[in-house]
Amino acid sequence: AKEQGMYLPVVYNTGGYERVETLKMLDGLVDIYLPDFKYLNTDHAKKYSMAEDYPEVAKAAIAEMVRQAGKPVFDERGMMKRGVIVRHLLLPGCLADGKRVVKYLHETYGNRIYMSLMSQYTPLESLDAAKYPELNRKVPEYAYEKLVDYAISLGVMQAFIQEGDTAKESFIPPFTLEGV
C-alpha cells in the first residue's frame, strides 16, 4: 500500500511503563507514540500501579519516544504524521501531582510534544472502594479546570483538553477479550 502512495501512521498506544531497550527495537517502525504519564508521585505509583519506579521508567521511555519520533509533523489536513502525544489522566485528589506532571513535560519537552490532559476518570463498581476510597469518585470539574489553567499559565500551547461530562462508563471499552 505504501508503494502505491497510501500512508497510515503507525501509532503505539502505551501506559508509559516501557523499557528503553524495548522501545529501541521499535525505532523506525512507529510514527506516533501515545504514552500515558500517570504520576510523578512515587507513592501514587506504588499504591495504584504497584510500580514505585513508574515515574523514572516513564520519564526514560518518553525521552526515547521523543528521540525516535521527533517534533510533531502534520499533513495538509491537520492529521499528525509523526510525533508524541503524552496523555495525563487527572485522578481524584491528585491535582498537585497532575501539575507536577504538566510542569515536568513542559519544561523538559516544550513544543516537541503534545499533551492530552484528560478528565474522564470514572470510578467503577469493581473498584475496591475500601482499598481506594479516595478514587471512588469523579474528578471535580473545578480541579480539571485548575490543571488546564495551570498548563496555560506555564505557556503550554500544544495540548488537547476535554469538555465536561466525559467521565461516563460509556467511554470505557468492554475488556471482555471476546473475539481475540
Model-flagged regions — what are they?
Residues 1-72, 161:
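Core AdoMet radical
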Residues 71-180:
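Auxiliary Fe-S-binding modules of radical SAM enzymes
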